[in-house]
Every structure is written in structure tokens, then in C-alpha cells.
From Swiss-Prot:
PANTHER family for this protein: PHAGE INTEGRASE-RELATED, TYROSINE RECOMBINASE XERC
Keywords: Cell cycle, Cell division, Chromosome partition, Cytoplasm, DNA integration, DNA recombination, DNA-binding
Residues at the catalytic site: R145, K176, H251, R254, H277, Y286
Tyr recombinase domain segment(s): 104-299
Protein name: Tyrosine recombinase XerD
Source organism, top-level taxon: Bacteria
Keyword Cell cycle: yes
GO function terms (MF aspect): DNA binding; tyrosine-based site-specific recombinase activity
Function: Site-specific tyrosine recombinase, which acts by catalyzing the cutting and rejoining of the recombining DNA molecules. The XerC-XerD complex is essential to convert dimers of the bacterial chromosome into monomers to permit their segregation at cell division. It also contributes to the segregational stability of plasmids.
Family according to the record: Belongs to the 'phage' integrase family. XerD subfamily.
Annotated ranges, domain Core-binding (CB): 1-83
Subunit and partners: Forms a cyclic heterotetrameric complex composed of two molecules of XerC and two molecules of XerD.
Location of this chain's protein in the cell: Cytoplasm
Organism: Rickettsia conorii (strain ATCC VR-613 / Malish 7)
Amino acid sequence: MGFIAQFLEMLLAERALSKNSILSYKRDLFDFQNYLAKHKLSELNITTENIRDWIEYLASNDLQARSINRKISTIKSYYEFLISENHTAFNPVLNVDLPKYQNKLPEILSIAQIKSLLEHCSQDNSPEGIRLNAMIHLLYASGLRVSELVSLKLADILTNKTSKGEVRKIFSVLGKGNKERVIVINEQAVISIAKYLTIRGVFVNKAKPRNLIYLFPSSALAGYMTRQNFAILLKSAALYAGLNPEYISPHILRHSFASHLLEGGADLRVIQELLGHADISTTQIYTHLQTNHLKKALLRHPLNKN
């Protein structure tokens, strides 16, 4: 077994990372190894200067600073693993400065734009339209990550009764780091999912038993709709709803969910829990977003001459 395979196996066993995180590590490592091979370098004998050259190479290929930093972090972790396994004694990434980047505020849709998108989707009564309507309603009602949305299982749908005896739908979601959280969804999302469940069988491929367990089954290898396919369908729906598809993505719906909750007075800690953020500082970016919107609103004040 090669060093990379050993490292990925360790990540899977000890850090409980998601499949997507493991794939990201794998891509970064193979890209790095391809660079080393191209420049006739050995991973066990490279210098810090070699690493700086590699970073310059990444930047020259128009890779954003955030992406470069992620790759550096991957390689640094990889060398820490190699040292722990006595394959090398030196981490060439240790004294490398990370490229600086601006922490951009997330893009969001207005409530009016969200309503326009949802109204358009609810008018399509084809099986594909009913499914997409359910997925978009659920995404905006929950703030799920797209990877969490598409991989939901039927068993993740739970029901529970309120103190008034009302039955409501909740979802048990396994997020990053295998951390479980519970999501309660609104009535519109419940209705759209109930409608979808009546036609879900259209998408079940009985020849592939694996897809039977998923809420949004498909013929894809994983057994459920891919993130990429959902993103394409979402952009198409946005176009027909009169919105610019360039500014629509599953992640923007997640940002919109969080921002609109904060705007409505929700506590930041509650939003952190709903989004599945491990650190409150990740959630705090939405407070900066709200401040930004307030500044723009004040600029429109009639007595503001600037």
C-alpha cells in the first residue's frame, strides 16, 4: 500500500471525515504528486523552497488563495503523517507562509427571489418537477449542505408530536465529522415532500437495490442524485423563474436560509446548530452580512448626501 493510501485510510479511521472530504484530500495529494513527477522530485526529499515553487505554480494557474491554502493544509497534514510513521524526518511545509485572501461575504437571494423560485417550481407537475420542488423547498427550509440533501435516506424522516398534539416532520441529518443534528421543517416543505413521496417510485430502479433506501434515488453509482445534477436542475429552474442562474447555487440557498433567519431575529447559536457549524465564528459571517445590508439601506436614506 502506498503512502497516500495509508494516509487516506488513517483519515477515514481516526478523523471520521466525510467521503467528500476524503476525495478532496485525495485529489490534492495526487495533483501534488503529479507536480513532483513532472519536476523529477521525490516526496521524501523535497525542500521548503520546492514547496514555495509549487505554490507559485498554483498561483500562476489562477488558483484562488483559499484553494491554495487548502492544498497546503492537505500537504502539511500528509507530511505530519509521514513523520509519525517514520517515513521522513522533515516537514517541508512547516515554515511556508500561507497566501492571504479576502474573506468574501456570502451571496444570498432576497426573500422575493426565493418566493419567485419556489412559486415557479410548484407549477411543474411532472415527476421531475415535483421532485425538484421538494428538494428546493427542503433545502431552503433546512439550510442543509447539498451533500446532506441529496444523500438523505427515507429512514432519516421522522415524525414527532408537539405539546398541542400537532404532527410535524423532522429530519435526522448526519453532517460533517459524522455529527448528527435534527432539523424541523416548515409546513410548505412538508407538503412538497408529501406530494413527492406519492411519485417517488418513478425514480426507484428496482434492479439496483441500493437506491431503495434514499429519499431522492437515482441510477447514479451512489444510488442517489448527484450534487452536480441537482445544481444543474436548480440553475435551470432559476432561469425559468426569471432569475440569473449565475447567482444561484445550492450553497447560496443555504446562505439565504441562514441570513433570513438572522434577519427574522433568530439567535446565532440556534443558526449555528441548524447549519451544523462546529465553530460559532463560521456562523458569525452572517452578522457581517446583515451589517453590510444595513449600510446599503442607510445609503438610500433621503438625508444622506454621500
